[in-house]
């Protein structure tokens, strides 16, 4: 049976894991790393780079290197948080065809879902390379506190790669699975997940294979990227104060600042002070300018203190919704790269009154949990029951713009709930069902997920028609809403599943694009392998020609030299052709045969000159027989 993989599609880094026997195992990528940067870059010649290769060239190609795009999923272009990010990232955020925030590279627009598909493809290929077989099914994680229809987002890019998403689970829940799989005694735990782009807090009861989420809360725009941006803003302000130059308008400088900020932030988790040194960051009429600045842990903590404090309110809300106090939490599990920051750990300790658990790798635990859930669905992991919840209340707009809840927040999913409504006016022949999500009392203050009309109602007095509205949420958090007129049996429904602004035609195009890139990648890899073989052969042929060229005729030397030159030209081409390189490699090997024969004869002659005359053919046979007999005798005597 083909393996089902677990993928943590993160804002900053992504990770893929699989069940290996009874244990979940993180799969290393082609670069030998256990996590892959969630970055995609496009070079001037159209080549696409994903992961570490994209990160390595970011400084020289800042406008076409895309990172943290997951933060834009489901965001409108006019969103205040998007507006702020637009001025702090080196690439361009544009308005998509559907009004959502998209990104641009080399003059072409991409939806966040398309970029996610490219990263997913990298994770899929990583797993296939390790397993040695095609991967067709996966469990993918999403932030627990997505405040709209975004839990469905991973399905679309995954489908474009031929990857069936068996289950979408929340990141803290996945982390709890990895943490508590071997825990038999009952525990109440809090999973504090501060990742690259989002913050989640979940309260769970675990024990004897049952993982029940009691509540979840969070902030969809709070993560490591915000900490980096805060430090970038500080560096920009300091440089402007000292030099009078605003680096915000310099894309290359911004990319260098972003990398330096991330590096400094990481270093200050283990040291008290670091130095940021960026020579030639910019230049003016007086010459080049350099940025050199000492940064202490205390200064960093003062810059980001309000960001850390923003995690407290969601934690308190989650505790209240779960009906427990901080003292009743047995263990606090830290997840996400930002949880390594000492200030974050200090705040968690103060809030929950205990040292947080640091026994899991915060970068890998979510992918491991996804792999365990994949194992559950595949039947490899027995006696595990996962009960997740919906993070926000769901309902419809009723008379006067009131938000009427059908499903309360933190309801265990899957779930189904129905309620009967009626018309507000006499002879009303249609009703509009507006589906919203949130905790405000008025529908306009909540997030509108979608709407649809139930039409052709028979004329009747107000309050007479019986319209049954049903909310159905599956285990993936995907919402389906239906409205049925009990009198006529007429029914309409809507599936709340964000598509990232892509039509079916767009999705089909993405499938073809993915296939096209797979072919291009294969060709590029073949060309590199052929070039490596060619360069090795050229080197050995040139050395042999130099050392033993006098052993062959002038015509043979010329033929070998010409073949070497032809192979060099083919392998050094700007767009090398693997077939052409292979053909010219074969030609060089063939014309070099006489040279190889001459080398062999020369070596044999040298061997004879050293006082060991080459034995006759007959002698060889006798020697072999003699040695065999002697060996047998040794065996007998033994």
UniProtKB/Swiss-Prot annotation:
Region (Disordered): 514-542, 605-638
UniProt modified residues of type Phosphothreonine: 198
One Pfam family it belongs to: HSP70
Origin: domain of life: Bacteria
Compositional bias annotation for Basic and acidic residues: 514-529
Functional description taken from the UniProt entry: Acts as a chaperone.
Family recorded in the similarity comment: Belongs to the heat shock protein 70 family.
UniProt protein name: Chaperone protein DnaK
Gene, per the UniProt record: dnaK
């Amino acid at each position: 049976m083909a393996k089902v993989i677990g993928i943590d599609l993160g804002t900053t880094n992504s990770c893929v894991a699989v069940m290996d026997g009874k244990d979940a195992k993180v799969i290393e990528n082609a670069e030998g790393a256990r996590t892959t940067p969630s970055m995609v870059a496009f070079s001037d010649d159209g080549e696409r780079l994903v992961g570490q290769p994209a990160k390595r060239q970011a400084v020289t190609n800042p406008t076409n290197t895309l990172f943290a795009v997951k933060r834009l999923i489901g965001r409108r272009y006019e969103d205040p948080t998007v507006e702020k990010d637009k001025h702090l990232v080196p690439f361009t955020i544009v308005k998509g065809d559907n009004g959502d925030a998209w990104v641009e590279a080399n003059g072409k627009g991409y939806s966040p879902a398309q970029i996610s598909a490219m990263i997913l493809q990298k994770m899929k290929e990583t797993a296939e390379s390790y397993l040695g077989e095609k991967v067709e099914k996966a469990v993918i994680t999403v932030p627990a506190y997505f405040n709209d229809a975004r839990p469905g987002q991973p399905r679309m890019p995954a489908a474009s790669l031929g990857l069936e998403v068996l289950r979408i689970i929340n990141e803290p829940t996945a982390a709890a699975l990895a943490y508590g799989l071997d825990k038999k005694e009952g525990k109440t735990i809090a999973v504090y997940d501060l990742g690259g782009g989002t913050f989640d807090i979940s309260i769970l009861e675990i024990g004897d294979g049952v993982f029940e989420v009691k509540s979840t809360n969070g902030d969809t725009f709070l993560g490591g990227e915000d900490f980096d941006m805060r430090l970038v803003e500080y560096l920009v302000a300091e440089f402007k104060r000292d030099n009078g130059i605003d680096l915000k308008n310099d894309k290359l400088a911004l990319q260098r600042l972003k990398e330096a900020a991330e590096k400094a932030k990481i270093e200050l988790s283990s040291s008290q002070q670091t130095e940021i040194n960026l020579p030639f960051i910019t230049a003016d009429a007086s010459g080049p300018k350099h940025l050199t600045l000492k940064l202490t842990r205390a200064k960093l903590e003062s810059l980001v203190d309000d960001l850390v404090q923003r995690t407290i309110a969601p934690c308190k809300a989650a505790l209240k919704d779960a009906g427990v106090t901080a003292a009743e939490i047995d263990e606090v599990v830290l997840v996400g790269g930002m949880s390594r920051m000492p200030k974050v750990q200090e705040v968690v300790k103060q809030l929950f009154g205990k040292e947080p658990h640091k026994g899991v790798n915060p970068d890998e635990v979510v992918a491991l949990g996804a792999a365990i859930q994949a194992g559950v669905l595949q039947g490899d992991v027995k006696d595990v029951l996962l009960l997740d919840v919906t993070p926000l209340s769901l309902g419809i707009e009723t008379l006067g713009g009131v938000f009427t809840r059908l499903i309360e927040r933190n309801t265990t999913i899957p779930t189904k709930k129905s309620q009967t409504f009626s018309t507000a006016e006499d002879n009303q022949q249609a009703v509009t069902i507006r589906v919203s999500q949130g905790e405000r009392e008025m529908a306009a203050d909540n997030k509108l997920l979608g709407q649809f009309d139930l039409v052709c109602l028979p004329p009747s007095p107000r309050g007479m028609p019986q319209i049954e509205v049903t909310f159905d949420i599956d285990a993936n958090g995907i919402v389906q809403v239906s409205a049925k007129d009990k009198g006529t049996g007429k029914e309409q429904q809507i599936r709340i599943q964000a598509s990232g602004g892509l039509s079916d035609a767009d999705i089909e195009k993405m499938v073809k694009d993915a296939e096209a890139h797979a072919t291009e990648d294969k060709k590029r890899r073949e060309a590199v392998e052929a070039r490596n073989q060619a360069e090795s052969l050229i080197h050995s042929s040139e050395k042999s020609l130099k050392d033993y060229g006098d052993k062959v005729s002038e015509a043979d030397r010329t033929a070998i030299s010409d073949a070497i030159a032809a192979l060099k030209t083919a392998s050094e081409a700007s767009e090398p052709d693997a077939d052409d390189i292979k053909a010219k490699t074969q030609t060089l090997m063939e014309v070099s045969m006489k040279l190889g024969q001459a080398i062999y004869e020369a070596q044999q002659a040298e061997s004879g000159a050293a006082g060991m005359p080459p034995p006759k053919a007959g002698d060889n046979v006798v020697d072999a027989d003699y040695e065999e007999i002697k060996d047998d005798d040794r065996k007998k005597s033994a």
